[in-house]
């Protein structure tokens, strides 16, 4: 049998699989897509040192009931780089989809606080600040049913090099938060939560 140490290790392994990535689909990003709405979300880290968390910006595009996560910008950036990346991500979305994102959701913590202040001062981006008021597991649990709306790009375009790491991070997310990184999970949570509260079923009008 397993000793206590072995049993604890086994329980830790089992503690993954909070997010069922099997329900996430794919879309053909080789074809031009028309979207109803585009939003961006950002999860920012405290610093750019190599042990720090990553800062992440996600581009989420709504088409009917589907949510296409079309691009992830991810890196360890200093504040000026973070600000530049945020503006670049917004402009990339405008140029790519000929649609101005309606909301740029930024978590009001770490460097996100200063980022919100600076972007408000320097730009006219549609900023929306969010303050996390629950632990990460509770937050993610509240949107688990929304993951089936999520679709990822299927082509081997180098811009999609983030997809495999993204799925790995989702799979590794644990209730006890002993996973290595959850910056892409956080970005996804904010998008799914925001869009779930704003989705309208057309059957309501029939």
Kindly give the residue locations of the regions a language model identified:
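Hydrophobic positions within alpha-helical membrane elements
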Residues: 48, 112, 188-191
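ATPase catalytic-site recognition across NTP-hydrolyzing enzymes
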Residues: 1-44
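A generic fold-level signal
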Residues: 33-34, 52, 182
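Mg2+-dependent endonuclease catalytic cores in nucleic-acid-processing enzymes, primarily RNase H-like
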Residues: 37-39, 56-176
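Acidic two-metal-ion nuclease catalytic site recognized across multiple nuclease folds
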Residues: 1-6, 14, 189-206
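Charged alpha-helix within mobile-element recombinases
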Residues: 166-193
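Generic detector of well-ordered alpha-helical packing
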Residues: 44, 108, 183-187
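An active-site-proximal beta-strand-loop segment
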Residues: 42-55
